[in-house]
Curated annotation (Swiss-Prot):
This is Natriuretic peptide NsNP-b. It is found in: Secreted. GO terms for biological process: regulation of blood pressure; vasodilation. Snake venom natriuretic peptide that targets both NPR1 and NPR2. Exhibits hypotensive and vasodepressor activities. Disulfide bonds join 12-28.
Length: 39
């Protein structure tokens, strides 16, 4: 799984995110999800 695909592709909710992809990706870091947080 790619960190970029997992973060933006599925996001935290596992849904195809576009404009909110960035926002969800950042918040994903705090949530214990199988998504590797970047910054």
């Amino acid at each position: 799984s790619g960190s970029k695909t997992a973060k933006i592709g599925d996001g935290c909710f596992g849904l195809p995110l576009d404009r909110i992809g960035s926002t969800s990706g950042m918040g994903c870091g705090s949530v214990p999800k199988p998504t590797p947080g970047g910054s």
